[in-house]
UniProtKB/Swiss-Prot annotation:
It is found in: Secreted. Induction: By lipopolysaccharide (LPS). Keywords: Chemotaxis, Cytokine, Disulfide bond, Inflammatory response, Secreted, Signal. GO terms for biological process: antibacterial innate immune response; antimicrobial humoral immune response mediated by antimicrobial peptide; cellular response to lipopolysaccharide; chemokine-mediated signaling pathway; inflammatory response; leukocyte homeostasis; neutrophil activation; neutrophil chemotaxis. This is C-X-C motif chemokine 5. Belongs to the intercrine alpha (chemokine CxC) family. Disulfide bonds join C53-C79, C55-C95.
């Protein structure tokens, strides 16, 4: 038994309006475009628009030598607590306890080293300006 399309089941192409021909394409674009926009958006933008805390669990201790970057997210409408996220040298992210004394020392040390770098850069700019 074979399935064959009857001639009465066919719709003549001249009787379909241009709108009806474009409807399936418009439908597909309508539902696939937002997905592509969401995938193309940077993760920081997505994280900023989510109204929830990033850190669900925190670590009270970490070796400072493992930290490549440190991000502090202040308390706000997305989360009532301050969040400290450390990006490690192995590309993992760890949430740190901002109230832990060890973490406070690490943050102060990083901020202190940033101030020292800024002073060195300012002195270097002054020296190059005085030489010219």
């Amino acid at each position: 038994m074979s399935l064959q399309l009857r001639s009465s089941a066919r719709i003549p192409s001249g009787s379909i309006s241009p709108f009806m021909r474009m409807a399936p394409l418009a439908f597909l674009l309508l539902f696939t475009l937002p997905q592509h926009l969401a995938e193309a958006a940077p993760s920081s933008v997505i994280a900023a628009t989510e109204l929830r805390c990033v850190c669900l669990t925190v670590t009270p201790k970490i070796n400072p030598k493992l930290i490549a970057n440190l991000e502090v997210i202040p308390a706000g409408p997305q989360c009532p607590t301050v969040e400290v996220i450390a990006k490690l040298k192995n590309q993992k992210e760890v949430c740190l306890d901002p109230e832990a004394p060890v973490i406070k020392k690490i943050i102060q040390k990083i901020l202190g080293s940033d101030k020292k770098k800024a002073k060195r850069n300012a002195l270097a700019v002054e020296r190059t300006a005085s030489v010219q």
